[in-house]
Amino acid sequence: AFAGILADADITAALAACKAEGTFKHGEFFTKIGLKGKSAADIKKVFGIIDQDKSDFVEEDELKLFLQNFSAGARALTDAETATFLKAGDSDGDGKIGVDEFAAMVKG
């Protein structure tokens, strides 16, 4: 799904680094997969993949399964990791992350 945007080796390394519960840190993950240095258009494409219900927002249930977008066998995020991730990205407090909020979080 991320072909042409992200390198498989970077994704594999990033997933390995947060394999244990409680170790997911979104900033480190975005850096490791190489997303931080990508164009706004590429970041928007990645958002579109993560936004599985195509609502133009990434909601809590989609965040919980965030890692599985990168590898079907990846773990779900814990409730605490999901809450931290949502809080970091939800700058307007509406309980979900829009594309601009996602881009700001990636670049952050």
Curated annotation (Swiss-Prot):
The keyword Acyltransferase does not apply. It holds the Pfam family EF-hand_7. Keywords: Acetylation, Allergen, Calcium, Metal-binding, Muscle protein, Repeat. Ca(2+) 2 binds at D90, D92, D94, K96, E101. InterPro entries: EF-hand-dom_pair (IPR011992), EF_Hand_1_Ca_BS (IPR018247), EF_hand_dom (IPR002048), Parvalbumin (IPR008080). Ca(2+) 1 binds at D51, D53, S55, F57, E59, E62. The keyword Amino-acid biosynthesis does not apply. The modification N-acetylalanine is found at A1. One of its GO terms (molecular function) is calcium ion binding. Gene3D superfamilies: EF-hand. SUPFAM superfamilies: EF-hand. Coiled coil: none annotated. Residues 38-73, 77-108 form the EF-hand domain. One of its GO terms (cellular component) is cytoplasm. In muscle, parvalbumin is thought to be involved in relaxation after contraction. It binds two calcium ions. Is regarded as an important allergen. Belongs to the parvalbumin family. This is Parvalbumin beta 1.
